[in-house]
Amino acid sequence: MVIIDKIKSLLLPAYARVVVISDIHGEIELLKSLLEKVNYNREDYLIINGDLCEKGSNSLAVVKYIMELSEENPKVYVLEGNCDTLVENLLEEDPWLLNYISKRKNTLLNDCLKHLGVNMDTIRNISELNEIIKENFSSEFNWLNDLPTAIETDDFIFVHAGLDSVQDWKMTSRENALRMPSFLDKAHQANKLVVVGHWPVINYPAEIPSHNPIMDFDKKIIAIDGGNVIKETGQLNALIINKMPLGNEYFYTYVDRFPKCEIIKDYKIKADPKMTGSISYPLFEISPIEGEEFPEG
């Protein structure tokens, strides 16, 4: 088992505003809109809690933008998420990557090739792809490869997916730190609030489905993944922590892609209370017992 070996310590002052964003997934315009909405400034501590890349429209722009922010301001901290570790597959020249980027249009590697005007079909093997990336994007990929897995402060642990329930949380496997599903349904033994993304909060059972962050202070877990890109109705969340000696304050806000509309009439659904709630992908307890393939429309 590979445990977390890249842990960064952060000493926050008695008074501080901490802005935490996770699961950006290549949506550069949403990220900029969210930073503007929270009135982000250089005095804030900005923590990007993993998954800068993949699935969205411009992963390369997000990487470059956040990399620049972190180089200009020592109060910007960035963690790795599971979607950011594809750089390791590239460095190891894993042939699987060629199949991955041929099937997925919105990837960091495809963004890099597009930026260079290189057609994926002309690349003969993974070694050639690796050479192209190293020659043109070595600073970005080295930066991604060096990102820590967790950040620890006096009050908080920031990690992308979750912690194992072990006495010493630093013995958490890196795999679980980056990919653990539904951490809010589990427990941990760290005596600090653990802030995670990775698992869209709408996947957790609720009477009224919501993409807003969930703060469970009894479990000492705050989950902030708003399902951006992953969910059709998803949003990009920001957790705002006002750190103060006599007690912290917690707020959140979000941005999404949807146009603003005016509500002209209230409408109440007449539904059986027993039928309220939702089923959100992925819900592994549900398995299809019968099905068939349908042609794409």
Describe every region a protein language model picked out.
Residues R124-I222, N228-E232, M244, Y252-Y254:
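Acidic, His/Gly-enriched loop-helix segments that form or flank divalent-metal centers
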Residues V20, L46-I48, V78-L79, I157, ...:
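Residue-level marker for buried hydrophobic side chains located in beta-strands
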Residues K55-P148:
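Active-site neighborhood of divalent metal-dependent phosphoester bond hydrolases
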Residues M1-K64, E72:
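N-terminal active-site segment of His-dependent metallophosphoesterases
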Residues S33-K37, A61-K64, E92-D94, T172-S173, ...:
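Short, glycine/charged-enriched secondary-structure capping and boundary segments
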Residues D23, D51, I66, G81-N82, ...:
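Divalent metal-coordination and catalytic microenvironments
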Residues H25-E29, E54-S57, C83-V87, S165, ...:
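Active-site environment of divalent metal-dependent phosphoester hydrolases
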Residues V196-G297:
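Acidic, His/Gly-rich catalytic cores of divalent-metal-dependent hydrolytic chemistry
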